[in-house]
Amino acid sequence: PWLAGLSALCLLAGLYLAFSTDGDYQQGNTVRIMYVHVPAAWLSMMCYTVMALSAIGTLVWRHPLADVSHKSAAPIGAAFTLIALITGSLWGKPMWGTWWVWDARLTSVFILFLMYLGLIAFNKRWTTRQRRRVSVRC
């Protein structure tokens, strides 16, 4: 219960800061989208790290919870990566004049999104734990 209260307090503080701060002198009010975009991008990378550590735990120690953690982190990471891609393009349109620029960072986040989708497809396709371990090794 105290963790839920702390989460609600942080959410309220973030909402207050997002709506009460002034716009940037160059970006105007479009800078406010960074309050959503940056945490989503960080969480997408964090889910990828959790999946990598879980894959190591599955391959080395063959712990069943590592396999569950690996399988559970993929949809969460895909959702946050999609949020980061959408909010990034919403920010990029007024700043760059286009929705998408083939920058290395943008392209790597898009490839990360495709990797998440591929891993989700592997997990949906193979239901036995042994075959999922093979997909982790790939």
What name fits each language-model region?
Residues 1-23, 28-29, 34-96, 101-138:
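Hydrophobic cores of alpha-helical transmembrane segments in multi-pass integral membrane proteins
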